[in-house]
Each structure stands twice: as structure tokens, then as C-alpha cells.
Amino acid sequence: MLSVRNLVHRYGDTVAVDGVSLDVADGECVVVTGANGSGKTTLVRHCNGLLEPDDGEVLVNGTPVGEDLVAARASVGMVFQNPRDGFVGATVGADVAFGPENLGRPREEIDARVADALDAVELGGRRDERVADLSGGEQERVAIAAALAMRPDHLVLDEPFTGLDWPARQSVLDRLRALHAAGTSLIVVTHDLRDVWTLADRVVAMRDGEIALRGDPADVRGALPDAGVRPP
């Protein structure tokens, strides 16, 4: 379980997240949407301690993130918008191995984690290829594999479809469906609900740093325009 409790985050005098509470159950897919500047990216960056709250807290499996940052980051994987800016290895395998190596895991375990993660995103035969030579969709899948190699309970993806053409978007979406079916919790941040509508167990719409709407996709669809969100 990932729990956000009365979270507040400020950038100077601007309140980016204002008293937000949200629970994400094991195996659930929650889609967080809203216009630019609504606070959705700031919210999810608290989920594994990338940001510190001004008030409130985030708990991962019952433990506040700030009390055990290493455990939180092992449990909550992050895939950032434009992940190609954050690749740390020249090859696919080196990039995916980076996280487990930093955990100090044995080489045999690292190799197994890398193999499992690449298989999960259907890049098992691409381990020795240069990340820079891959397509945008393939690079997105490498970023997902790098997060999966940490064997997280929850996977947070910030605008995972940005800049991808239609076939690449569908490829990434297929991988997310498979991960969801296998029991991985997903928190997907997007301003465009068309790709993830059928994937979501719940939709959370943010506006001005607050949750304006939340619920099952079928229940909230008609109210999305009132929350400032274009329906799919």
C-alpha cells in the first residue's frame, strides 16, 4: 500500500500540492490527470522521496518515506518524462543494471534482475545494444525495465507516452497492461486519458494543487470537464 496523507508542497509562495490524500492499493492502477501546473508531477515525486513535503507525509507499506529512503526507493520505481535524458549506461543492459548495482546486489542476482526486466518489456535480445540507437518507444521501455530491475511493488510513470508515435504508444501500453495483470501497482501521470482509460482502476483529476475528482473511470467520465480535464 502506498498512502499519501494531507500532503503539502510549496515552491516559494506557490502551493503546488495542497492537502492531498490518496491511497494506492497493491495491484491497483491509478491514473493521475490534470492540466499543466495542476500539481500532478509534484505529487508523484514525493512517492519515493524525490521531494520532501512541507506538511503531511507519504507512507510505503506503512513506513514514512523519510524514515527509510532506501526501502522506499526500492519499493517505488520511477519512470520520468523524457527518460532519455536520464540514461546512465551506454548499453541497454548497463542502464538496467545500474539500480541493482547501487543496491550492492551480487552479480548473479543483478544479471537475473536485468534479464527478467528486459523480458518483461520484450527487449530480452537487445541487452548489448546502445540505448542511443533505439527508437523513442524502445527507450521508454528501457526506462521501465530499469525501474522493474529494482523489483518495486509500485511503479510511477510520469507522462510515459509523450513524444511517442502511435505504434510506440501502443507498445508501451501493452507492457503496462502486462505488468498490471501480473500484480504491479501502477501510478500513471498523464494529461491525455486516451491511452490509459481502459487500463485505469481509478482516475484522480487534479486542479490547482488539489484533487478535484476521483473515482472509477465509468463514474467520473461525465464530470471530467468540470475538473478541467478533457474526457477520452
Swiss-Prot record:
Disulfide bonds: none annotated. Its main location: membrane. Keywords: ATP-binding, Cell membrane, Membrane, Nucleotide-binding, Translocase, Transport. One of its GO terms (cellular component) is ATP-binding cassette (ABC) transporter complex. InterPro entries: AAA+_ATPase, ABC_transporter-like_ATP-bd, ABC_transpr_CbiO/EcfA_su, ECF_ABC_transporter_ATP-bd, P-loop_NTPase. Residues 2-231 form the ABC transporter domain. The keyword Kinase does not apply. ATP binds at G34, A35, N36, G37, S38, G39, K40, T41. Probably part of an ABC transporter complex. Responsible for energy coupling to the transport system. Belongs to the ABC transporter superfamily. This is Putative ABC transporter ATP-binding protein VNG_2317G. It comes from Halobacterium salinarum (strain ATCC 700922 / JCM 11081 / NRC-1). The lineage of its organism: Archaea, Methanobacteriati, Methanobacteriota, Stenosarchaea group, Halobacteria.
